[in-house]
Design a protein with these regions (language model features):
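Active-site helix of classical SDR
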Residues: 16, 24
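Short, small/polar-rich loop/turn modules that mediate ligand/substrate recognition or access, typified
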Residues: 32, 37, 107-109
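Conserved SDR Rossmann-fold cofactor-binding beta-strand/turn motif
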Residues: 37-47, 100, 113-115
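A short C-terminal helix-loop "cap" of Rossmann-like NAD(P)-dependent dehydrogenase/epimerase domains
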Residues: 56-80
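A conserved structural motif in NAD(P)-dependent oxidoreductases
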Residues: 66-68, 80-92, 103
Length: 122
């Protein structure tokens, strides 16, 4: 569930995610002068064994194919995910690899959303 979900039932999960982001921001400020950079990565609906299990369950509950279960989930639960697919673990890993590289030596205290543009901001 994304941090920005409107589902009231997800309040505790959203609260925990907000806490993780606040922790990352606080640690980034605390340890930057020691050369430690802290950032967060917030993936959305990623192709994992957990989401496979979720979609298998949804498929059985709805009496539809696995792919149709994903499509209905995206339409109903994640209408703001513009790419209309699950992200791949490699796409999240690429962001993490960048953050671990020398190319990110001036990146600190940021949250990288790997989420298909789920949250539109300026």
């Amino acid at each position: 569930t994304p941090l920005y979900s409107s589902a009231a039932s997800d309040v505790y999960k959203r609260q925990a995610k907000a806490g993780v982001l606040a922790l990352a921001k606080g640690l980034s400020r605390t340890y930057a002068r020691e050369g430690l950079l802290v950032n967060a990565v917030s993936p959305a609906f990623i192709h994992t064994p957990m989401t496979d299990a979720m979609m298998n369950k949804r498929s059985k509950e709805l009496g539809v194919s696995f792919d149709e279960a994903i499509e209905s989930f995206l339409d109903q639960e994640r209408p703001y995910m513009e790419l209309k697919r699950r992200g791949e673990p490699e796409e999240v890993a690429a962001v993490i690899a960048f953050l671990c590289s020398d190319k990110a030596s001036f990146v600190n205290g940021s949250n990288y959303r790997v989420d298909s543009g789920s949250v539109a901001t300026f």
